[in-house]
Amino acid sequence: MPVYRVFPHGGRLNGTALGRCNKKGATVILPKDRDPRFITIRRGGTLADSDHRLLALWAAACAEHVLHLFESVQPSDPRPRQACEQTRAWARGEITMSQARAAAGAANAAARELSGAARHAAYAAGQAAVVAHVAAHELGAAAYAIKAARAAAPGCEGESAGRLECRWQREQLPDAIRELVLEDQRLRNEICWSVFDC
């Protein structure tokens, strides 16, 4: 089983802090040793460009599904929605990876200004956009979207809302990447706040 590095803000597992934030305060959940299944063939891995694009599109769908939670709090801030749009534009070959990554940074900046569901939804959009740079960020978009759904749920319905969001996400998975993503969820579930227990 791969070893993972985790840098969550406020993240804890069994009472133990999991790590630290990156310089900008955003969570980074990536394998210490990169999984070759999430590295494109041209960079020495096994990921086809077509599957890389599908991962990005799925991540964008996950983020867009909860984006209203951000927009209801910050209706005049377009950065997270633009990140999702840039993700889709990258998948169509209309923009460069660097442009998508810049959109991710803008969405993450929007997230840092907030808390709760709105913050998680904006981070989901940022994670989706950075899939263009590192395919393994696909789980970041999904995990943050689930966290947003949990945070937005009333009372003690958060766990149930998270499971429903997780199931919805899995229904959106294209067949070509389904097993890859489900296996990634199994491997990284614990460091992703165990949100993929659905």
Residues covered by each model-derived region:
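N-terminal amphipathic/basic-hydrophobic helices that include classical n-h-c signal peptides
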Residues: 1-26
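Structured binding/interaction patches within domain cores
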Residues: 19-175, 196
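Mature, well-folded catalytic/scaffold domains that follow N-terminal targeting or propeptide regions
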Residues: 172-198
